[in-house]
Amino acid sequence: MNGLRRKAAMLRTSVGLAAITAAIGIIPGVAQQSHPATVPVTAAPAPAPAPVPDPMRTDWANLKRFHDEDVALAAPAAGVKRVVFMGDSITQGWVHNGVPPEPADAAKDWVNRGISGQTTPQMLIRFRPDVIDLKPSVVVILAGINDIAGNTGPMTLEETEGNLASMAELAAAHGIKVVMCSIMPAFDFPWRPGLEPAPKVIAVNTWMKAYAAEHGFVYVDYHSAMVDSRGGLPKTLSNDGVHPLKAGYAIMLPLVEAGIAKALAAN
């Protein structure tokens, strides 16, 4: 009797276990497969935009600025003496103040090759395509203030003078008359205050005047005609103390015209 009770109890236990395993999906004798957890799919990030080339790395001297105009420029007309103005923003500013002159003045073949912010080493690099290759009779060079401001890095005054001399001598070697213009007065730089440029300007101008006389070049002294008691440009001639207004260019124009005439008259 006791044996029958034990068998019945064991049977009930087996049935209960079978029910439990069936309920949780376990089938005896069948290996269970593991199911990995679902990993959410993350969209690939959008490609980064292509970096914008730094022009100071790809074209430091800005040779492309006047390339197309240089190529398209016809040779000087017969009997007309071409003059190229090489410089920085002050030369570029001539565009609205007489260089190039009004189209009606066909007797003046004046070509403006000023680029704002440039220093003398940049100008020296582009001197051949922007000056020599244009076959001018005269080049007017106005440069150096941005060297003193450190626009392209620290420079000594001797380095500035060397670059000015190199441009002048390159021109002379190609039969181009040279007009060297004094650096304009500057008491301070609004974009780099505290550099005290006034005495440095005077030092380069003193060298330039002597160098021009020694080599037979023309020296145009804008500085003496425009400087104020501080050694800078007065507010009547400049809003920022560096770039001349129309009133400033009105003083400069007859001076540079006289310099060009003197250069053309020289043997």
Predicted features and spans:
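N-terminal secretory targeting modules
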Residues: M1-M86, T91-N97, L134, A261-N267
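Short, flexible loop segments at the rims of nucleotide/cofactor-binding pockets, characterized by
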Residues: T58-L63, I115-T119, P197
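Alpha-helical cap/lid subdomain in secreted, periplasmic
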Residues: R5, G16, E102-D109, Q118, ...
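Hydrophobic residues at beta-strand termini and immediately following loops
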Residues: M86, R113, V220-Y222
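Soluble periplasmic/extracytoplasmic beta-strand elements of cell-envelope proteins
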Residues: R82-V84, V111-N112, K177
